[in-house]
From Swiss-Prot:
<dbReference type="GO" id="GO:0051289">
    <property type="term" value="P:protein homotetramerization"/>
</dbReference>
<feature type="domain" description="Kinesin motor">
    <location>
        <begin position="173"/>
        <end position="565"/>
    </location>
</feature>
<keyword id="KW-0547">Nucleotide-binding</keyword>
<feature type="coiled-coil region">
    <location>
        <begin position="10"/>
        <end position="94"/>
    </location>
</feature>
<dbReference type="GO" id="GO:0007018">
    <property type="term" value="P:microtubule-based movement"/>
</dbReference>
<dbReference type="GO" id="GO:0005524">
    <property type="term" value="F:ATP binding"/>
</dbReference>
<dbReference type="InterPro" id="IPR036961">
    <property type="entry name" value="Kinesin_motor_dom_sf"/>
</dbReference>
<feature type="region of interest" description="Disordered">
    <location>
        <begin position="417"/>
        <end position="460"/>
    </location>
</feature>
<dbReference type="GO" id="GO:0005737">
    <property type="term" value="C:cytoplasm"/>
</dbReference>
<dbReference type="Pfam" id="PF00225">
    <property type="entry name" value="Kinesin"/>
</dbReference>
<dbReference type="GO" id="GO:0005874">
    <property type="term" value="C:microtubule"/>
</dbReference>
<keyword id="KW-0067">ATP-binding</keyword>
<comment type="function">
    <text>Minus-end microtubule-dependent motor protein. Acts as a negative regulator of centrosome separation required to prevent premature centrosome separation during interphase. Required to maintain a centered nucleus to ensure that the spindle is stably oriented at the onset of mitosis. May also act as a negative regulator of amino acid starvation-induced autophagy.</text>
</comment>
<keyword id="KW-0206">Cytoskeleton</keyword>
<dbReference type="InterPro" id="IPR019821">
    <property type="entry name" value="Kinesin_motor_CS"/>
</dbReference>
<comment type="similarity">
    <text>Belongs to the TRAFAC class myosin-kinesin ATPase superfamily. Kinesin family.</text>
</comment>
<dbReference type="GO" id="GO:0008569">
    <property type="term" value="F:minus-end-directed microtubule motor activity"/>
</dbReference>
Amino acid sequence: MPAGGGRWGSFWEQRTRQLQSQVRAKEDKIAELETENAVLLLKLAEYKGKIEKSRSEATRISTLYNKQQRLQRNTRSALSQLDGVIQKLNQDIQAFHSSSRALLRDYQDEYQDRVSAIVTAVQRTRQSAETLLACQAKVVHLEQALQDVSARHQLERQRRKALHNSLVELRGNIRVHCRIRPLLPFDSESDDPVLQSSSISREVAHAVDDETVLVKCDRPGHPLINKTYHFERVYGPAESQSAVFGDVCPLLTSLLDGYNVCVMAYGQTGSGKSYTMLGPHSDDGPVLPLDPQSDLGIIPRAAEELFRLISENPSRSPKVEVSIVEVYNNDIFDLLAKDTVAAVSGVKREVMTAKDGRTEVALLASEAVGSASKLMELVRGGLQLRAKHPTLVHADSSRSHLIITVTLTTAACSDSTADQACSATHPGEQTEAGRAGRSRRTSQGASAPQPVPGDPAGRAEQVQARLQLVDLAGSECIGVSGVTGSALRETACINRSLAALADVLGALSEHRSHIPYRNSRLTHLLQDCLGGDAKLLVILCISPSQRHLAQTLQGLGFGIRARQVQRGPARKRPPSSQMEGKRRPD
């Protein structure tokens, strides 16, 4: 079976080769499929990546879509709200347009009205400007005319005042100046409920000008009455002490020219008499004024001015002596008298009538002074002894009349040339000095005179002139001052002496045959200056308050009576030799 076996062997070999080729074909197919599978796997991986990307993109797109949906919803809501706002704005715009049109119409109407008003105003302004120009021209003309009239008025006032002063000199009238003090805190103080409820501190006295006082008399149960008083000079509440002294100063020149001078302060208590005469109250007393604007009164200013005037003419330097008295309870006390131990103490004195008819105080102490400071030192010493007592009206009320006398003893002119020089200052007064009927002073009490060549008696002729500065105690209403006991007696004596002074002035003004000087020691002591040949100035001090209306009217009435006194012209003091020839026989 080799032959058979050979066929089977080739068959199997062929079959094997066939199977091997099929296997190789299958392997190639497998390789191809594996390759294709690998490619597919790659594509699958690629597709998976794409799918993953697609999913991510889808998720992103879904998220964006959701956001877009929300945004759309929000947008629709916002658009809906915006539509509402737009509608509201459209409505507001329409309303605004309507109101704007209405407002514009109103503004146009108002504009037309204003334009019309402006045109009218411009026309009126033009007319007013023309009128104003005419008025200005008229005002300029009137101002010029007023200045001319004022200048003429001032000139006429000066002429009238000069003529009035000349008339006062010729008639010998008492000069009366009125001073109105300011309102003070105590003017509104009162224990009376009726007075407290009324206007007691209302100002009723006014200085209309420098010569006129107006008093508004408004008393309960009476109609309002305005009373006017005229004086040589009126000082308002704002006028200073220097202004008051400015009108007193010329009298000091007259004193050095040989005239007797008296300055007297009169008024109710608390009206400013002591302030006017001395200055503000001080425990140290008045001093010399350091400047013209100080508050010091007439007495310290007069002391300084007197010695200033004396120093300007040292060739005729007079001897200056001072005496100080007070009239207290109708008794006269010498405030410069000294006791046994040389201490100053008030000593009671008496008034007497000298041989030449003048009044003087017996045994009156006087001291020579050489300066204003020495004079004021004596005044301060006298003031410390002056009687004072507090009242409801015045806490430092003076209870006595103070009289300071300054006596100047001067050598008389010895020849005709000197006589002419002496009379040059006051022309016409030498002739007047020869008239009779006036009391004269002698040189008693003066130092031993020096001889003058040609004097047969071997002594120099001397002239004495006297300056009296009087601070009267104030009149009081007992119900207002509230005084009791000894102060009540003081008030009674003060009021009686002031009433006696008013009686004397009334008798002098009426030219009565009898003048009651001796009704009071005050009037007896002041007889020479009241009815004699002294230049007398009364400073009437009044309160402006409604509370003191009655006393103010009383004081003004006193001043009017004083102005009516005509005593003849004042005269210079004659030399002592002429005085000797005119003395009455013992």
